[in-house]
């Protein structure tokens, strides 16, 4: 079974669009891009366009790769104070001379629609419901809901411990809710007995960013595979590259119960949850 993200994402986006039409005023989303990473440029343009298609006010702010920390913090302060902006996100990764956590922590928690501010991460860990949840983890849970895949009591193995996916996803899946309440094991590329552990998973989520890392030998026949990784590998095509995930898709498909494709799986869900978070931030600021 192929778990495509578009059908689930389209439903979320349609609801957001209808909600915006029913309200006076428009949500405002600001996207900050630092440097000239081609992939980041594509992602920023996609997010800005999607927001505008839904009826939001969406602005992109571009800074050169040699921008100073002071420059970035000054811009974020302006956006924090702008009453027409309800969501602020900084596109990652950042140039190496900039401290990611310092910049993310400077965004107002009430406008942190990416859900990466320490306040929002802490609320997630504590099970509080008034913060913003990081978009990829929340998108994965929504994907399970759409395909009616139960998480309650299931063994979920997560490959990867990043602050963007692995850590917040583990906290989200362990919440004592009817839609989650899973038993979670978090591994990484240096974990011992990795293959033996992944084969015990009811659900395997890979988010380590290593192309084709997950092989068929790591999967059981009952397993549902969620591939969060997206990597460019050289290819003989006009672009000169292809997008692949962490999972050796062609060889894993025959041995697993269900799997997300790359591209077209988790990616659309991440964008949809960003739009939902921006809408919810608008409501919190206006009601």
UniProtKB/Swiss-Prot annotation:
InterPro entries given in the database record: Aminoacid_DH-like_N_sf, NAD(P)-bd_dom_sf, THF_DH/CycHdrlase, THF_DH/CycHdrlase_cat_dom, THF_DH/CycHdrlase_CS, THF_DH/CycHdrlase_NAD-bd_dom
Swiss-Prot/TrEMBL catalytic activity: (6R)-5,10-methylene-5,6,7,8-tetrahydrofolate + NADP(+) = (6R)-5,10-methenyltetrahydrofolate + NADPH; (6R)-5,10-methenyltetrahydrofolate + H2O = (6R)-10-formyltetrahydrofolate + H(+)
GO CC annotations, alphabetized: cytosol
Keywords, ordered alphabetically: Amino-acid biosynthesis, Histidine biosynthesis, Hydrolase, Methionine biosynthesis, Multifunctional enzyme, NADP, One-carbon metabolism, Oxidoreductase, Purine biosynthesis
Keyword presence, tRNA-binding: no
Entry's EC annotation: 1.5.1.5, 3.5.4.9
GO terms, molecular function: methenyltetrahydrofolate cyclohydrolase activity; methylenetetrahydrofolate dehydrogenase (NADP+) activity
This protein's record includes keyword NADP: yes
Pfam families registered for this protein in UniProt: THF_DHG_CYH, THF_DHG_CYH_C
Functional summary from the UniProt entry: Catalyzes the oxidation of 5,10-methylenetetrahydrofolate to 5,10-methenyltetrahydrofolate and then the hydrolysis of 5,10-methenyltetrahydrofolate to 10-formyltetrahydrofolate.
Assembly: Homodimer.
PANTHER family: C-1-TETRAHYDROFOLATE SYNTHASE, CYTOPLASMIC, C-1-TETRAHYDROFOLATE SYNTHASE, CYTOPLASMIC-RELATED
UniProt protein name: Bifunctional protein FolD
Protein's organism: Chlamydia muridarum (strain MoPn / Nigg)
């Amino acid at each position: 079974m192929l778990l495509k993200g578009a059908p689930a994402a389209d439903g979320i986006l349609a609801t957001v669009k209808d909600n915006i039409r029913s309200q006076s005023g428009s949500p405002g989303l600001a996207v900050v891009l630092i440097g000239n990473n081609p992939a980041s440029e594509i992602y920023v343009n996609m997010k800005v366009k999607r927001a505008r298609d839904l009826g939001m006010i969406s602005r992109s702010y571009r800074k050169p790769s040699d921008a100073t920390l002071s420059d970035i913090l000054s811009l974020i302060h302006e956006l924090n104070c702008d009453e027409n902006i309800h969501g602020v996100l900084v596109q990652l990764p950042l140039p190496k001379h900039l401290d990611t956590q310092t910049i993310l922590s400077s965004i107002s928690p009430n406008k942190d629609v990416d859900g990466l501010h320490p306040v929002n991460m802490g609320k997630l860990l504590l099970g509080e419901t008034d913060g913003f949840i990081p978009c990829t983890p929340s998108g994965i849970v929504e994907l399970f809901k759409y395909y009616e895949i139960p998480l309650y009591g299931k063994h979920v193995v997560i490959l990867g411990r990043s602050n963007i996916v692995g850590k917040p996803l583990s906290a989200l899946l362990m919440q004592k809710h009817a839609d989650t309440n899973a038993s979670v094991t978090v591994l990484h590329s240096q974990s011992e007995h990795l293959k033996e552990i992944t084969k015990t998973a009811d659900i395997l989520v890979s988010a380590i960013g290593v192309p084709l890392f997950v092989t068929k030998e790591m999967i059981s026949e009952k397993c549902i595979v969620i591939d969060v990784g997206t990597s460019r590998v050289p290819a003989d095509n006009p672009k000169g590259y292809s997008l692949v995930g962490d999972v050796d898709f062609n060889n894993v498909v025959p041995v697993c119960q269900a799997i997300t494709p790359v591209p077209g799986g988790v990616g659309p869900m991440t964008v949809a949850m960003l739009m939902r978070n921006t809408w919810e931030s608008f409501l919190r600021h206006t009601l």
